């Protein structure tokens, strides 16, 4: 803090340069030197500065032109993308509609196929039942026939004695002899 106050105090001790005013001595103020330097700078620097500004202007114009071309290309790509999107949406709607109708058609085909399969299974079941019924009735008939035959044989065996047996044989021989005489 002391250094700050000392610097203000030392400012107060500087010798005064004089009063404020214009110095009219041209050589003392270096106006000629300044004007010569400015003239040389303007004369030689004008071309360089002009070239720099022209180059900068061309770069800016090229950048703007490129930006416009990119913008137009982006707009064109956006329109193409929108057209593709519309086309894809239309195709998706067609696929959706066709898909639903295809699903319905497949569903109906599946139902028809299932009904036909069930009908075939029902027919096969009925044929199997009829076959089994015929087989069972044939077995019953065969069984009844065998039992009747066994019963008849049992009756014949119990009824037949030797005398009846000999008479039956004699009667059959007589029938055969009569048939032979008719045929001769």
Swiss-Prot record:
Keyword terms of this UniProt record: ATP synthesis, CF(0), Chloroplast, Hydrogen ion transport, Ion transport, Membrane, Plastid, Thylakoid, Transmembrane, Transmembrane helix, Transport
Principal subcellular localization: plastid
Further facts: In plastids the F-type ATPase is also known as CF(1)CF(0).
Task: Write out the similarity annotation.
Answer: Belongs to the ATPase B chain family.
Its assembly, as annotated, is:
F-type ATPases have 2 components, F(1) - the catalytic core - and F(0) - the membrane proton channel. F(1) has five subunits: alpha(3), beta(3), gamma(1), delta(1), epsilon(1). F(0) has four main subunits: a(1), b(1), b'(1) and c(10-14). The alpha and beta chains form an alternating ring which encloses part of the gamma chain. F(1) is attached to F(0) by a central stalk formed by the gamma and epsilon chains, while a peripheral stalk is formed by the delta, b and b' chains.
What PANTHER family does the database record attribute to this sequence? Answer: ATP SYNTHASE SUBUNIT B, CHLOROPLASTIC
* Protein's name according to its UniProt entry: ATP synthase subunit b, chloroplastic
- Its source organism is Guizotia abyssinica (Niger)
What broad taxonomic lineage does this protein's source fall under? Eukaryota, Viridiplantae, Streptophyta, Embryophyta, Tracheophyta
């Amino acid at each position: 803090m002391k250094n700050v106050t000392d610097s203000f105090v030392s400012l107060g001790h500087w010798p005064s340069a004089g009063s404020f005013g214009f110095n009219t001595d041209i050589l003392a103020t270096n106006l000629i030197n300044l004007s010569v330097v400015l003239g040389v700078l303007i004369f030689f620097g004008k071309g360089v500065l002009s070239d720099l500004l022209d180059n900068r202007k061309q770069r800016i114009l090229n950048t703007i032109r490129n930006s416009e071309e990119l913008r137009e290309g982006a707009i064109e790509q956006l329109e193409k993308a929108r057209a593709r999107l519309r086309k894809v949406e239309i195709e998706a709607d067609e696929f959706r509609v066709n898909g639903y109708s295809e699903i319905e058609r497949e569903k109906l085909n599946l139902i028809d196929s299932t009904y036909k399969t069930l009908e075939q299974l029902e027919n096969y079941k009925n044929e199997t039942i009829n076959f089994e019924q015929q087989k069972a009735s044939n077995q019953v008939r065969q069984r009844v026939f065998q039992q009747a035959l066994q019963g008849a044989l049992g009756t014949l065996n119990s009824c037949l004695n030797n005398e009846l047996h000999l008479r039956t044989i004699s009667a059959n021989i007589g029938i055969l002899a009569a048939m032979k005489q008719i045929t001769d």
